[in-house]
Amino acid sequence: MPIGNLGNNVNSNNLIPPAPPLPSQTDGASRGGAGQLINSTGALGSRLLFSPLRNSIADSVDSRDIPGLPVHPSRLATATSEICLLGGFEVLHDKGPLDTLNKQIGASAFRIEQQSDGSYAAIGEKNGVEVSVILNSQELQSLQAIDIEDKGRFVFTGGRGGGGHSMVTPASDIAEARAKILAKLDPNNHGGSQARNVDTRSVGVGSASGMDDSVVSETRTSSTASSVRSDPKFWVSIGAIAAGLAGLAATGITQALALTPEPDDPTTTDPEQAASAAESATRDQLTQEAFKNPENQKVSIDEIGNSIPSGELKDDVVAKIEEQAKEAGEAARQQAVESNAQAQQRYDTQYARRQEELELSSGIGYSLSSALIVGGGIGAGVTTALHRRNQPAEQTTTTTTHTVVQQQTGGNTPAQGGTDAIRAEDTSLNRRDSQRSTASTHWSDTSSAVVNPYAEVGEARNSSPARQAEEHIYDEVAADPNYSVIQNFSGNNQVTGRLMGTPGQGIQSTYAILTNNSAGLRLGMGGLTGSGGSAVNTANAAPTPGPGRFV
Protein backbone atom coordinates (compact mmCIF):
# COMPACT_ATOMS: atom_id res chain seq x y z
CA MET A 1 0.00 0.00 0.00
CA PRO A 2 1.74 3.19 -1.08
CA ILE A 3 2.30 5.92 1.43
CA GLY A 4 1.18 9.31 0.39
CA ASN A 5 -2.43 9.90 -0.62
CA LEU A 6 -4.37 10.06 2.61
CA GLY A 7 -7.39 11.19 0.65
CA ASN A 8 -8.30 7.52 0.24
CA ASN A 9 -9.42 7.40 3.88
CA VAL A 10 -13.15 6.81 3.58
CA ASN A 11 -13.79 7.72 7.23
CA SER A 12 -12.55 11.32 6.86
CA ASN A 13 -14.78 12.22 3.91
CA ASN A 14 -11.70 13.01 1.83
CA LEU A 15 -10.88 16.01 4.01
CA ILE A 16 -7.39 14.84 4.94
CA PRO A 17 -4.85 16.50 2.66
CA PRO A 18 -2.35 14.32 0.78
CA ALA A 19 0.77 13.57 2.78
CA PRO A 20 4.17 13.65 1.08
CA PRO A 21 5.74 10.26 0.37
CA LEU A 22 8.74 8.93 2.21
CA PRO A 23 11.95 8.47 0.20
CA SER A 24 11.32 4.73 -0.12
CA GLN A 25 7.96 5.34 -1.88
CA THR A 26 6.77 1.99 -0.53
CA ASP A 27 4.75 0.76 2.39
CA GLY A 28 7.06 -0.91 4.86
CA ALA A 29 4.47 -1.29 7.57
CA SER A 30 3.15 -4.54 6.18
CA ARG A 31 6.46 -6.34 6.69
CA GLY A 32 6.76 -7.70 10.14
CA GLY A 33 4.80 -4.98 11.92
CA ALA A 34 1.28 -5.22 10.59
CA GLY A 35 0.28 -7.95 13.02
CA GLN A 36 1.09 -6.00 16.14
CA LEU A 37 -1.31 -3.57 17.74
CA ILE A 38 0.05 -0.11 18.48
CA ASN A 39 -0.68 0.80 22.07
CA SER A 40 -1.13 4.27 23.53
CA THR A 41 -1.02 4.77 27.27
CA GLY A 42 -1.58 8.52 27.24
CA ALA A 43 -4.61 10.33 28.51
CA LEU A 44 -7.73 10.62 26.45
CA GLY A 45 -7.10 14.30 25.72
CA SER A 46 -3.69 13.49 24.25
CA ARG A 47 -5.18 11.02 21.76
CA LEU A 48 -7.90 13.14 20.24
CA LEU A 49 -6.12 13.30 16.90
CA PHE A 50 -5.86 9.55 16.47
CA SER A 51 -8.41 7.46 14.65
CA PRO A 52 -8.38 3.83 13.49
CA LEU A 53 -8.53 3.48 9.72
CA ARG A 54 -11.35 1.42 8.32
CA ASN A 55 -10.67 -0.86 5.35
CA SER A 56 -6.95 -0.77 6.12
CA ILE A 57 -4.31 -3.23 7.17
CA ALA A 58 -5.34 -2.85 10.79
CA ASP A 59 -8.79 -4.31 10.07
CA SER A 60 -7.28 -7.53 8.81
CA VAL A 61 -5.27 -7.85 11.98
CA ASP A 62 -7.59 -6.72 14.73
CA SER A 63 -11.02 -5.15 14.35
CA ARG A 64 -11.04 -3.71 17.84
CA ASP A 65 -10.99 0.03 18.38
CA ILE A 66 -8.59 1.42 20.91
CA PRO A 67 -10.66 2.82 23.78
CA GLY A 68 -11.04 6.56 23.77
CA LEU A 69 -10.31 7.16 20.07
CA PRO A 70 -13.07 8.69 17.93
CA VAL A 71 -14.34 6.62 15.02
CA HIS A 72 -15.22 9.67 12.91
CA PRO A 73 -12.55 12.28 13.60
CA SER A 74 -14.14 15.52 12.49
CA ARG A 75 -11.16 17.46 13.82
CA LEU A 76 -8.74 15.87 11.42
CA ALA A 77 -9.53 18.47 8.73
CA THR A 78 -8.41 21.39 10.90
CA ALA A 79 -5.61 19.77 12.89
CA THR A 80 -2.01 20.89 12.57
CA SER A 81 -0.03 17.64 12.56
CA GLU A 82 -0.03 14.69 10.24
CA ILE A 83 2.03 11.55 9.81
CA CYS A 84 1.23 8.28 8.11
CA LEU A 85 2.01 5.12 10.07
CA LEU A 86 0.50 2.42 7.93
CA GLY A 87 -0.17 0.09 10.84
CA GLY A 88 -3.70 1.43 11.06
CA PHE A 89 -3.45 5.01 12.33
CA GLU A 90 -3.07 8.49 10.91
CA VAL A 91 -1.85 11.66 12.57
CA LEU A 92 -1.86 15.05 10.86
CA HIS A 93 1.56 16.50 10.11
CA ASP A 94 2.72 19.89 11.33
CA LYS A 95 1.52 22.84 9.28
CA GLY A 96 2.23 26.42 10.19
CA PRO A 97 1.45 29.84 8.71
CA LEU A 98 4.23 29.46 6.15
CA ASP A 99 2.55 26.34 4.74
CA THR A 100 -0.75 28.20 4.65
CA LEU A 101 0.87 31.15 2.89
CA ASN A 102 2.41 28.80 0.36
CA LYS A 103 -0.98 27.27 -0.36
CA GLN A 104 -2.69 30.66 -0.68
CA ILE A 105 -0.32 32.54 -2.99
CA GLY A 106 1.16 29.68 -4.96
CA ALA A 107 4.27 27.58 -4.74
CA SER A 108 6.64 29.86 -6.64
CA ALA A 109 8.20 33.26 -6.01
CA PHE A 110 6.43 36.07 -4.22
CA ARG A 111 7.13 39.64 -3.17
CA ILE A 112 6.22 41.85 -0.23
CA GLU A 113 4.63 45.24 -0.84
CA GLN A 114 3.25 47.84 1.54
CA GLN A 115 -0.42 48.62 1.05
CA SER A 116 -2.13 52.01 1.22
CA ASP A 117 -3.35 51.34 4.76
CA GLY A 118 0.19 50.67 6.01
CA SER A 119 -0.11 46.90 6.11
CA TYR A 120 2.16 44.54 4.23
CA ALA A 121 0.95 41.92 1.79
CA ALA A 122 2.65 38.92 0.22
CA ILE A 123 1.85 38.94 -3.50
CA GLY A 124 2.29 35.83 -5.62
CA GLU A 125 0.80 34.15 -8.66
CA LYS A 126 -1.42 31.11 -8.39
CA ASN A 127 -2.96 29.46 -11.45
CA GLY A 128 -2.10 32.50 -13.56
CA VAL A 129 -3.86 34.93 -11.20
CA GLU A 130 -2.08 37.38 -8.91
CA VAL A 131 -3.02 36.70 -5.30
CA SER A 132 -2.18 38.84 -2.26
CA VAL A 133 -2.32 37.86 1.42
CA ILE A 134 -2.02 40.35 4.28
CA LEU A 135 0.87 39.41 6.61
CA ASN A 136 0.70 39.83 10.35
CA SER A 137 3.55 41.40 12.28
CA GLN A 138 5.17 38.09 13.21
CA GLU A 139 5.15 36.82 9.65
CA LEU A 140 6.50 40.13 8.33
CA GLN A 141 9.31 40.19 10.90
CA SER A 142 10.25 36.60 10.10
CA LEU A 143 10.51 37.33 6.38
CA GLN A 144 12.40 40.57 6.96
CA ALA A 145 14.86 38.73 9.21
CA ILE A 146 16.16 36.67 6.28
CA ASP A 147 15.94 39.48 3.71
CA ILE A 148 19.25 41.18 4.47
CA GLU A 149 19.30 43.11 1.19
CA ASP A 150 15.74 44.34 1.87
CA LYS A 151 14.61 43.52 -1.66
CA GLY A 152 11.30 42.03 -0.59
CA ARG A 153 11.44 39.06 -2.98
CA PHE A 154 11.36 35.46 -1.82
CA VAL A 155 11.15 31.95 -3.25
CA PHE A 156 9.38 28.92 -1.79
CA THR A 157 11.78 25.97 -1.52
CA GLY A 158 9.58 23.45 0.24
CA GLY A 159 9.11 19.70 -0.03
CA ARG A 160 12.67 18.85 0.93
CA GLY A 161 13.32 15.15 1.01
CA GLY A 162 9.65 14.28 1.32
CA GLY A 163 9.20 16.36 4.48
CA GLY A 164 6.43 18.34 2.85
CA HIS A 165 7.30 21.59 4.64
CA SER A 166 7.25 24.91 2.89
CA MET A 167 10.50 26.81 3.22
CA VAL A 168 11.41 30.32 2.11
CA THR A 169 14.72 31.85 1.07
CA PRO A 170 15.48 35.26 -0.50
CA ALA A 171 15.35 35.25 -4.27
CA SER A 172 18.78 36.87 -4.40
CA ASP A 173 20.27 33.85 -2.62
CA ILE A 174 18.79 31.47 -5.18
CA ALA A 175 20.20 33.53 -8.06
CA GLU A 176 23.59 33.83 -6.36
CA ALA A 177 23.70 30.12 -5.58
CA ARG A 178 22.87 29.24 -9.17
CA ALA A 179 25.53 31.58 -10.51
CA LYS A 180 28.19 30.19 -8.18
CA ILE A 181 27.32 26.59 -8.96
CA LEU A 182 27.48 27.30 -12.69
CA ALA A 183 30.79 29.08 -12.21
CA LYS A 184 32.10 26.05 -10.29
CA LEU A 185 30.98 23.66 -13.01
CA ASP A 186 32.31 25.81 -15.86
CA PRO A 187 35.02 28.11 -14.42
CA ASN A 188 36.28 29.20 -17.85
CA ASN A 189 32.74 29.73 -19.12
CA HIS A 190 33.69 28.31 -22.47
CA GLY A 191 30.39 26.65 -23.22
CA GLY A 192 32.01 24.77 -26.06
CA SER A 193 31.82 21.24 -24.79
CA GLN A 194 28.66 19.25 -24.57
CA ALA A 195 28.36 16.05 -22.65
CA ARG A 196 27.06 13.13 -24.58
CA ASN A 197 26.38 9.46 -23.98
CA VAL A 198 25.55 9.87 -20.29
CA ASP A 199 24.67 6.53 -18.73
CA THR A 200 23.70 6.48 -15.07
CA ARG A 201 22.84 3.22 -13.38
CA SER A 202 21.84 2.66 -9.78
CA VAL A 203 21.44 -0.76 -8.22
CA GLY A 204 20.07 -1.26 -4.71
CA VAL A 205 20.19 -4.55 -2.81
CA GLY A 206 18.37 -4.79 0.50
CA SER A 207 16.51 -7.14 2.78
CA ALA A 208 13.26 -6.70 4.61
CA SER A 209 14.60 -8.32 7.76
CA GLY A 210 17.27 -5.64 8.29
CA MET A 211 20.41 -7.41 7.02
CA ASP A 212 23.30 -5.70 5.24
CA ASP A 213 22.17 -3.16 2.68
CA SER A 214 24.44 -2.39 -0.28
CA VAL A 215 23.84 0.44 -2.69
CA VAL A 216 25.98 0.63 -5.81
CA SER A 217 25.77 3.65 -8.09
CA GLU A 218 27.69 3.51 -11.35
CA THR A 219 28.00 6.58 -13.54
CA ARG A 220 29.53 6.48 -16.99
CA THR A 221 29.99 9.76 -18.79
CA SER A 222 31.60 10.27 -22.16
CA SER A 223 32.08 13.84 -23.31
CA THR A 224 33.65 15.10 -26.48
CA ALA A 225 34.97 18.50 -27.48
CA SER A 226 32.90 20.38 -29.97
CA SER A 227 34.34 21.20 -33.37
CA VAL A 228 36.24 24.42 -33.84
CA ARG A 229 33.58 25.39 -36.34
CA SER A 230 31.08 25.84 -33.52
CA ASP A 231 33.25 28.47 -31.84
CA PRO A 232 32.09 32.02 -32.69
CA LYS A 233 35.63 33.35 -32.33
CA PHE A 234 36.76 31.14 -35.19
CA TRP A 235 34.12 32.56 -37.52
CA VAL A 236 34.95 36.10 -36.44
CA SER A 237 38.55 35.45 -37.47
CA ILE A 238 37.44 34.01 -40.81
CA GLY A 239 35.25 37.07 -41.36
CA ALA A 240 38.20 39.36 -40.67
CA ILE A 241 40.29 37.52 -43.25
CA ALA A 242 37.50 37.78 -45.83
CA ALA A 243 37.08 41.49 -45.12
CA GLY A 244 40.81 42.01 -45.60
CA LEU A 245 40.80 40.23 -48.94
CA ALA A 246 37.82 42.28 -50.08
CA GLY A 247 39.63 45.44 -49.02
CA LEU A 248 42.67 44.48 -51.07
CA ALA A 249 40.54 43.91 -54.15
CA ALA A 250 38.64 47.16 -53.69
CA THR A 251 41.86 49.11 -53.25
CA GLY A 252 43.36 47.67 -56.42
CA ILE A 253 40.26 48.44 -58.47
CA THR A 254 40.13 51.98 -57.11
CA GLN A 255 43.75 52.63 -57.98
CA ALA A 256 43.26 51.30 -61.50
CA LEU A 257 40.13 53.28 -62.34
CA ALA A 258 39.71 56.28 -60.11
CA LEU A 259 43.25 57.59 -59.68
CA THR A 260 45.15 60.08 -61.91
CA PRO A 261 46.67 58.20 -64.85
CA GLU A 262 50.39 57.81 -65.08
CA PRO A 263 51.90 60.67 -67.22
CA ASP A 264 53.77 60.04 -70.45
CA ASP A 265 57.42 60.96 -70.81
CA PRO A 266 57.81 64.69 -71.60
CA THR A 267 58.53 65.65 -75.24
CA THR A 268 61.74 67.72 -75.46
CA THR A 269 63.39 69.67 -78.34
CA ASP A 270 67.10 70.33 -78.78
CA PRO A 271 67.52 74.12 -78.61
CA GLU A 272 70.59 74.13 -80.86
CA GLN A 273 68.87 72.16 -83.54
CA ALA A 274 65.85 74.41 -83.30
CA ALA A 275 68.02 77.51 -83.56
CA SER A 276 69.98 76.17 -86.55
CA ALA A 277 66.81 75.16 -88.35
CA ALA A 278 65.18 78.50 -87.71
CA GLU A 279 68.27 80.38 -88.79
CA SER A 280 68.57 78.45 -92.08
CA ALA A 281 64.90 78.83 -92.85
CA THR A 282 64.98 82.54 -92.20
CA ARG A 283 68.08 83.04 -94.31
CA ASP A 284 66.63 81.16 -97.26
CA GLN A 285 63.37 83.04 -97.07
CA LEU A 286 65.01 86.44 -96.90
CA THR A 287 67.40 85.59 -99.71
CA GLN A 288 64.55 84.63 -102.01
CA GLU A 289 62.72 87.81 -101.24
CA ALA A 290 65.88 89.87 -101.82
CA PHE A 291 66.42 88.41 -105.29
CA LYS A 292 62.96 89.50 -106.33
CA ASN A 293 64.08 93.09 -106.13
CA PRO A 294 66.76 93.84 -108.75
CA GLU A 295 67.99 96.72 -106.73
CA ASN A 296 69.28 94.32 -104.13
CA GLN A 297 71.59 92.70 -106.69
CA LYS A 298 74.94 93.82 -107.84
CA VAL A 299 75.09 95.38 -111.42
CA SER A 300 77.71 94.67 -114.03
CA ILE A 301 78.24 96.85 -117.17
CA ASP A 302 78.81 95.14 -120.46
CA GLU A 303 80.95 96.31 -123.39
CA ILE A 304 78.20 98.38 -124.80
CA GLY A 305 77.67 100.10 -121.44
CA ASN A 306 74.40 98.50 -120.43
CA SER A 307 73.67 97.60 -116.76
CA ILE A 308 73.18 93.87 -116.30
CA PRO A 309 72.20 92.18 -112.88
CA SER A 310 75.06 90.03 -111.78
CA GLY A 311 72.97 87.55 -109.75
CA GLU A 312 74.63 88.38 -106.48
CA LEU A 313 73.14 90.26 -103.62
CA LYS A 314 74.66 93.33 -102.39
CA ASP A 315 76.88 93.09 -99.38
CA ASP A 316 74.65 95.22 -97.20
CA VAL A 317 71.63 93.12 -98.14
CA VAL A 318 73.48 89.93 -97.32
CA ALA A 319 74.50 91.40 -93.98
CA LYS A 320 70.89 92.26 -93.11
CA ILE A 321 69.74 88.79 -94.10
CA GLU A 322 72.39 87.21 -91.93
CA GLU A 323 71.46 89.37 -88.97
CA GLN A 324 67.78 88.53 -89.25
CA ALA A 325 68.57 84.82 -89.58
CA LYS A 326 70.58 84.86 -86.37
CA GLU A 327 67.77 86.62 -84.55
CA ALA A 328 65.32 83.98 -85.75
CA GLY A 329 67.64 81.18 -84.63
CA GLU A 330 68.03 82.72 -81.18
CA ALA A 331 64.27 83.06 -80.84
CA ALA A 332 63.82 79.43 -81.82
CA ARG A 333 66.40 78.40 -79.24
CA GLN A 334 64.58 80.25 -76.45
CA GLN A 335 61.23 78.82 -77.49
CA ALA A 336 62.60 75.29 -77.46
CA VAL A 337 64.01 75.77 -73.97
CA GLU A 338 60.71 77.12 -72.64
CA SER A 339 58.73 74.34 -74.31
CA ASN A 340 60.95 71.71 -72.75
CA ALA A 341 60.54 73.30 -69.33
CA GLN A 342 56.75 73.38 -69.57
CA ALA A 343 56.56 69.76 -70.68
CA GLN A 344 58.73 68.68 -67.77
CA GLN A 345 56.62 70.69 -65.36
CA ARG A 346 53.41 69.08 -66.58
CA TYR A 347 54.97 65.66 -66.23
CA ASP A 348 56.23 66.34 -62.73
CA THR A 349 52.86 67.70 -61.58
CA GLN A 350 50.87 64.75 -62.87
CA TYR A 351 53.38 62.26 -61.50
CA ALA A 352 53.36 63.89 -58.07
CA ARG A 353 49.56 63.87 -57.94
CA ARG A 354 49.45 60.20 -58.85
CA GLN A 355 52.04 59.28 -56.25
CA GLU A 356 50.11 61.12 -53.57
CA GLU A 357 46.91 59.31 -54.44
CA LEU A 358 48.70 55.97 -54.49
CA GLU A 359 50.24 56.54 -51.09
CA LEU A 360 46.91 57.58 -49.58
CA SER A 361 44.94 54.67 -51.01
CA SER A 362 47.67 52.18 -50.19
CA GLY A 363 48.00 53.43 -46.63
CA ILE A 364 44.31 53.15 -45.95
CA GLY A 365 43.25 50.26 -48.14
CA TYR A 366 46.25 47.96 -48.19
CA SER A 367 47.32 48.58 -44.59
CA LEU A 368 43.86 48.08 -43.12
CA SER A 369 43.18 45.06 -45.30
CA SER A 370 46.53 43.53 -44.44
CA ALA A 371 45.90 44.12 -40.74
CA LEU A 372 42.53 42.39 -40.98
CA ILE A 373 44.07 39.43 -42.78
CA VAL A 374 46.92 39.10 -40.29
CA GLY A 375 44.62 39.53 -37.27
CA GLY A 376 42.09 37.06 -38.61
CA GLY A 377 44.81 34.54 -39.34
CA ILE A 378 46.25 34.86 -35.85
CA GLY A 379 42.80 34.57 -34.27
CA ALA A 380 41.90 31.50 -36.29
CA GLY A 381 45.23 29.89 -35.47
CA VAL A 382 44.96 30.58 -31.75
CA THR A 383 41.36 29.35 -31.61
CA THR A 384 42.28 26.15 -33.42
CA ALA A 385 45.28 25.61 -31.15
CA LEU A 386 43.16 26.09 -28.02
CA HIS A 387 40.58 23.62 -29.25
CA ARG A 388 43.25 21.07 -30.01
CA ARG A 389 44.84 21.57 -26.61
CA ASN A 390 41.57 21.28 -24.70
CA GLN A 391 40.24 18.38 -26.73
CA PRO A 392 42.20 15.53 -25.03
CA ALA A 393 41.13 16.67 -21.55
CA GLU A 394 37.46 16.75 -22.51
CA GLN A 395 37.39 13.49 -24.41
CA THR A 396 37.48 11.37 -21.27
CA THR A 397 35.32 8.52 -20.13
CA THR A 398 34.91 8.37 -16.38
CA THR A 399 33.34 5.55 -14.40
CA THR A 400 32.47 6.40 -10.82
CA THR A 401 31.19 3.76 -8.42
CA HIS A 402 29.62 4.61 -5.08
CA THR A 403 29.20 1.73 -2.64
CA VAL A 404 27.49 2.11 0.70
CA VAL A 405 27.14 -0.72 3.20
CA GLN A 406 24.86 -0.15 6.16
CA GLN A 407 24.22 -2.52 9.06
CA GLN A 408 20.63 -2.66 10.27
CA THR A 409 19.63 -4.87 13.15
CA GLY A 410 16.24 -6.42 12.99
CA GLY A 411 13.78 -6.08 15.80
CA ASN A 412 10.20 -6.83 16.73
CA THR A 413 9.12 -3.32 17.57
CA PRO A 414 5.47 -2.36 17.36
CA ALA A 415 6.26 -0.08 14.43
CA GLN A 416 8.63 -2.41 12.63
CA GLY A 417 6.85 -1.70 9.37
CA GLY A 418 8.64 1.64 8.97
CA THR A 419 12.16 0.15 9.12
CA ASP A 420 12.51 -0.07 5.36
CA ALA A 421 11.61 3.58 4.98
CA ILE A 422 14.18 4.62 7.60
CA ARG A 423 16.79 2.37 5.99
CA ALA A 424 16.17 4.01 2.61
CA GLU A 425 16.45 7.44 4.17
CA ASP A 426 19.69 6.65 6.03
CA THR A 427 21.08 4.97 2.93
CA SER A 428 20.54 8.15 0.97
CA LEU A 429 22.44 10.06 3.67
CA ASN A 430 25.37 7.65 3.57
CA ARG A 431 25.36 7.76 -0.20
CA ARG A 432 25.83 11.49 0.16
CA ASP A 433 28.94 10.88 2.27
CA SER A 434 30.41 8.49 -0.28
CA GLN A 435 29.70 10.93 -3.08
CA ARG A 436 31.54 13.58 -1.07
CA SER A 437 34.71 11.51 -0.98
CA THR A 438 34.40 10.55 -4.63
CA ALA A 439 33.89 14.15 -5.70
CA SER A 440 37.11 15.16 -3.92
CA THR A 441 38.99 12.56 -5.96
CA HIS A 442 37.52 13.52 -9.33
CA TRP A 443 37.36 17.27 -8.78
CA SER A 444 38.62 18.08 -12.29
CA ASP A 445 36.25 15.72 -14.08
CA THR A 446 33.77 17.56 -16.26
CA SER A 447 31.20 14.81 -15.63
CA SER A 448 31.06 15.21 -11.84
CA ALA A 449 27.46 15.34 -10.65
CA VAL A 450 26.15 18.18 -8.53
CA VAL A 451 24.23 17.10 -5.46
CA ASN A 452 20.99 19.02 -5.13
CA PRO A 453 21.44 21.30 -2.10
CA TYR A 454 17.80 20.59 -1.21
CA ALA A 455 17.97 16.82 -1.67
CA GLU A 456 18.89 15.17 1.64
CA VAL A 457 17.75 16.95 4.79
CA GLY A 458 16.57 14.16 7.00
CA GLU A 459 19.63 14.13 9.27
CA ALA A 460 19.48 15.76 12.69
CA ARG A 461 21.30 18.96 13.53
CA ASN A 462 23.76 17.14 15.82
CA SER A 463 24.76 14.32 13.48
CA SER A 464 28.10 12.56 13.28
CA PRO A 465 31.19 14.65 12.37
CA ALA A 466 31.56 12.72 9.13
CA ARG A 467 28.38 14.37 7.84
CA GLN A 468 29.33 17.92 8.76
CA ALA A 469 31.59 18.57 5.77
CA GLU A 470 30.04 19.87 2.60
CA GLU A 471 30.39 18.24 -0.81
CA HIS A 472 33.48 19.25 -2.72
CA ILE A 473 31.43 20.87 -5.43
CA TYR A 474 30.36 23.46 -2.84
CA ASP A 475 33.80 24.09 -1.29
CA GLU A 476 34.23 27.44 -2.98
CA VAL A 477 30.55 28.31 -2.84
CA ALA A 478 30.32 27.56 0.88
CA ALA A 479 33.00 30.15 1.57
CA ASP A 480 30.28 32.75 1.33
CA PRO A 481 28.47 32.83 4.69
CA ASN A 482 25.28 33.99 3.02
CA TYR A 483 25.15 30.93 0.82
CA SER A 484 26.78 28.25 2.92
CA VAL A 485 23.81 28.20 5.24
CA ILE A 486 21.61 26.94 2.42
CA GLN A 487 23.48 23.65 2.34
CA ASN A 488 24.77 23.30 5.88
CA PHE A 489 22.11 22.06 8.29
CA SER A 490 24.47 19.88 10.32
CA GLY A 491 26.99 20.55 13.05
CA ASN A 492 26.84 22.73 16.12
CA ASN A 493 27.17 26.10 14.39
CA GLN A 494 24.14 28.34 14.60
CA VAL A 495 22.37 28.99 11.32
CA THR A 496 22.44 32.67 10.43
CA GLY A 497 18.86 32.78 9.17
CA ARG A 498 19.21 32.97 5.42
CA LEU A 499 16.82 30.06 4.91
CA MET A 500 13.45 29.94 6.63
CA GLY A 501 11.88 26.58 7.38
CA THR A 502 12.45 23.36 9.30
CA PRO A 503 13.93 20.70 7.01
CA GLY A 504 14.07 18.09 9.76
CA GLN A 505 10.41 18.40 10.66
CA GLY A 506 7.37 16.69 9.33
CA ILE A 507 6.78 13.14 8.32
CA GLN A 508 10.41 11.99 8.30
CA SER A 509 11.51 12.82 11.84
CA THR A 510 8.22 11.81 13.45
CA TYR A 511 8.12 8.59 11.47
CA ALA A 512 11.64 7.83 12.64
CA ILE A 513 10.58 8.29 16.27
CA LEU A 514 7.62 5.96 15.78
CA THR A 515 9.56 3.22 14.05
CA ASN A 516 12.68 3.32 16.25
CA ASN A 517 10.82 3.35 19.54
CA SER A 518 9.69 -0.05 20.79
CA ALA A 519 6.79 1.58 22.60
CA GLY A 520 5.42 3.11 19.44
CA LEU A 521 3.46 6.18 20.42
CA ARG A 522 4.38 5.91 24.06
CA LEU A 523 7.58 7.99 24.32
CA GLY A 524 8.77 11.21 22.78
CA MET A 525 5.43 12.04 21.19
CA GLY A 526 4.36 14.92 23.35
CA GLY A 527 3.85 17.03 20.25
CA LEU A 528 1.30 14.66 18.68
CA THR A 529 -1.46 15.76 21.02
CA GLY A 530 -4.53 17.87 20.90
CA SER A 531 -2.67 20.65 22.69
CA GLY A 532 -0.44 23.12 20.87
CA GLY A 533 2.85 21.16 21.09
CA SER A 534 4.61 19.45 18.21
CA ALA A 535 6.93 16.48 18.26
CA VAL A 536 8.87 17.79 15.33
CA ASN A 537 9.55 21.04 17.12
CA THR A 538 10.79 19.01 20.10
CA ALA A 539 13.01 16.78 17.98
CA ASN A 540 14.56 19.44 15.79
CA ALA A 541 14.51 23.10 16.69
CA ALA A 542 13.80 25.59 13.94
CA PRO A 543 17.06 26.88 12.45
CA THR A 544 15.83 30.40 11.83
CA PRO A 545 14.88 33.33 14.05
CA GLY A 546 11.39 34.61 14.34
CA PRO A 547 8.17 33.19 15.76
CA GLY A 548 8.15 29.48 16.37
CA ARG A 549 4.93 28.96 14.48
CA PHE A 550 6.13 30.66 11.28
CA VAL A 551 8.54 27.97 10.10
UniProtKB/Swiss-Prot annotation:
Family that this chain belongs to: Belongs to the Tir receptor family.
Ranges annotated as biased composition (Polar residues): 283-299, 436-450
Signal peptide: none
Record protein name field: Translocated intimin receptor Tir
Name of the gene encoding the protein in the UniProt record: tir
GO cellular component: extracellular region; host cell plasma membrane; membrane
Localization in the cell: Secreted; Host cell membrane
Biased composition (Low complexity): 1-15, 212-229, 395-409
Entry comment on modification after translation: Phosphorylated by host kinases.
Amino acid composition bias (Basic and acidic residues), ranges on this chain: 422-435
Taxonomic lineage of the native organism: Bacteria, Pseudomonadati, Pseudomonadota, Gammaproteobacteria, Enterobacterales
Residues spanned by motif Essential for actin pedestal formation: 452-454
Region (Disordered): 1-36, 186-229, 259-311, 389-450
Record's bilayer topology term: Multi-pass membrane protein
Extracellular-facing ranges: 255-362
